[in-house]
Amino acid sequence: MPRPTSPHPDAERKSASPLHPRNRHLGRYDFPRLIAGSPELERFVILNPYGRQSIDFADPAAVKAFNRALLQQFYDVREWDIPDGYLCPPIPGRADYLHYLADLLGASHDGLIPRGPGLRALDVGTGANCIYPLLGHHEYGWRFVGADIDPQSLASAAAILAANPRFAAAIELRRQPDRRQIFQGLIGVDERFDMTLCNPPFHASLDEATRGSRRKWKNLGKLDPTRTLPLLNFGGQGAELYCEGGEAAFLAGMAEESRAFATQVFWFTTLVSKASNLPNLQERLKTLGASDIRVVDMAQGQKQSRFVAWTYLDKKQRRAWRKERWTAALLEPLGE
């Protein structure tokens, strides 16, 4: 019999703000079906105060088992695993970024979403979980380059791909050798990407990340001074959680570097966790000469999020890009 537990914001997320209409995780989780596909999940299942099956989202082991079950059931990803302490992302929210990104491409292509291997995406900071390339290739058939500065993250991602040959054929992993750079050293001279995506480090230091974790646990009523706390709800290593100057500095650096690749990328995009960082980023992009800057709002349960997208291509350049790279793609009308 699952044991009862206190509520968690993610546990009832589906009764709050909706996910993207194409998100596979609309509706409530079917735990019996998840357990049938991944029996190891059963020992982590609990009853929430509403009498429904859930897991303790503050338990990294439970979240990892839950993610493994979701990835196997919905995305045909086998033997997914990450080292202890690495970021274990919430799958529905990561999928939403990709679906809204597909909408952005569709809005740039007469309402038709381009699918298939002709489109290439660069995932900056792919992490040990390799989550965006896995979901993006499954949902839209895009090819990905997953980049990271951490060798252990890339080794973990490589192990996932080795267990999933179908994905490995479409996903290339690259190491960024210089942690001070983002696009430099990753994008080749004649290389083109239809989109970039990124989940930037949120904090400015390990101490700040730990304080943020303690605040979240206190709000959940779970703060136990004798317990070793995972960083945030889903773990995470240094480069995944913090960088010098925090999110604002990272976004500023990304904006500056993007200018050098203005004609090699159609849409640059990045998540922005702190809404207060939006005005400076938008102003900087205008100064750098971006021809189109968009803020795409998203919502997963009680959490509000957004990503910023920008391009330096003018209308003529965009038409030429679409004609050269997207006309042969499989096309899907927006809203389907």
Swiss-Prot record:
The protein's Enzyme Commission number: 2.1.1.181
- Top enzyme class of this protein? transferase
Keywords per UniProt: Cytoplasm, Methyltransferase, rRNA processing, S-adenosyl-L-methionine, Transferase
Please give one Pfam family short name: Methyltransf_10
Q: Where in the cell is it found?
A: Cytoplasm
Query: Which HAMAP family has this protein been placed in?
Result: 23SrRNA_methyltr_F
Protein family (similarity comment): Belongs to the methyltransferase superfamily. METTL16/RlmF family.
Q: What is this protein called?
A: Ribosomal RNA large subunit methyltransferase F
